[in-house]
């Protein structure tokens, strides 16, 4: 078995890991504001306040809205996902085996992305209902009202992420699961990836925080949370003679930030 690694193979494998990460590594990255190719250890997301329109006199100056621009800093950290591969030569010729290893690295980095975003969502203190029951219709409507009263845009960019227990409870709500209310195209029974309801894309996630039997679910607008990434996923493959194996290390720099607290409503759901 050769212990030398062609740079062309490393680049190909690196590209496959990055494409897998972009395609399916993270479930939440596409639901938030994203910045790519960030240079340095941090970046800034702008939180823009509300503006007001007003009249002007003839030949007078156009009034300025004086929007509040608040910078929100997002720190980036380096994350690594590595594993030992005994037979690297097989990865060079066996596409299926190579894809399995590439996906494993991409999924690990994607789970870290979701973990960072969930940690920021958990900072929300805008609670709908209590933590003494599950995901009920009343709790959902209370959160819906909170979003509206906070002037969170109803522009198709609202997202709700819930646990699998809560997803099962949603299926018990007729307005969510019946074609009489949502039409045949939006029936959740046709697939469990995601479903649009109340102008929001609902999706189940296994990584939401569970504290004392209470699952923290979140309903938010895309502009309320941000994710930043440095350079694309990088891959390093090195031979270790003492282990007679190659070490495949995938790495990327990323971070997350809660930009606007008013754009997030948290639903605390009891799991029995």
Segments predicted by a language model, with ranges:
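Short, surface-exposed beta-edge/turn micro-motifs
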Residues: 41-42, 155-159, 245
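Short acidic, glycine/tyrosine-flanked loop/strand segments centered on an H-E-D-like triad
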Residues: 69-91
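Alpha-helical scaffold segments that mediate packing/assembly in large oligomeric complexes
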Residues: 86-152, 266-272
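Extended, solvent-exposed, turn-rich assembly/linker loops in the middle of proteins
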Residues: 123-193
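N-terminal "assembly arms/tails" that initiate or stabilize quaternary assembly
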Residues: 1-74, 264, 268-271
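Short helix/loop capping segments that flank catalytic or ligand/cofactor-binding pockets
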Residues: 53-56, 169-172, 257-259
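Glycine/small-residue-rich hydrophobic helix-like segments
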Residues: 192-240
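Extended, compositionally biased alpha-helical segments that mediate assembly or anchoring
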Residues: 237-272
């Amino acid at each position: 078995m050769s212990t030398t690694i062609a740079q062309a193979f490393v680049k190909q494998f690196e590209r496959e890991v990055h494409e897998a990460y972009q395609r399916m590594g993270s479930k939440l990255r596409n639901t938030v504001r994203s910045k790519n190719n960030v240079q340095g250890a941090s970046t800034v997301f702008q939180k823009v306040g509300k503006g007001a329109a007003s009249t002007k006199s003839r030949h007078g100056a156009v009034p300025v809205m004086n929007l509040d621009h608040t910078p929100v800093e997002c720190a980036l950290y380096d994350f690594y996902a590595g594993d030992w591969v005994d037979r690297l030569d097989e990865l060079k010729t066996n596409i299926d085996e190579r894809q399995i290893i590439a996906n494993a690295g991409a999924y690990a980095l994607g789970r870290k992305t979701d973990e960072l975003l969930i940690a920021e969502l958990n900072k929300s203190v805008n609670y709908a209902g209590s933590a003494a029951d599950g995901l009920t219709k009343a709790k959902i409507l209370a959160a819906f009202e909170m979003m509206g009263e906070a002037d969170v845009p109803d522009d198709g960019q609202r997202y709700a992420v819930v646990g699998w227990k809560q997803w099962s409870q949603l299926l018990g709500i007729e307005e969510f699961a019946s074609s009489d209310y949502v039409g045949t195209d939006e029936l959740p029974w046709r697939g469990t990836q995601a479903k649009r309801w109340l102008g929001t894309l609902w999706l189940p996630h296994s990584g939401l925080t569970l504290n004392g039997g209470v699952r923290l679910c979140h309903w938010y607008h895309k502009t309320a949370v941000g994710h930043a990434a440095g350079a694309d996923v990088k891959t390093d493959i090195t031979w270790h003679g003492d282990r007679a194996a190659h070490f495949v290390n995938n790495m990327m720099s990323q971070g997350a930030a809660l930009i606007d607290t008013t754009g997030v409503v948290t639903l605390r759901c009891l799991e029995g």
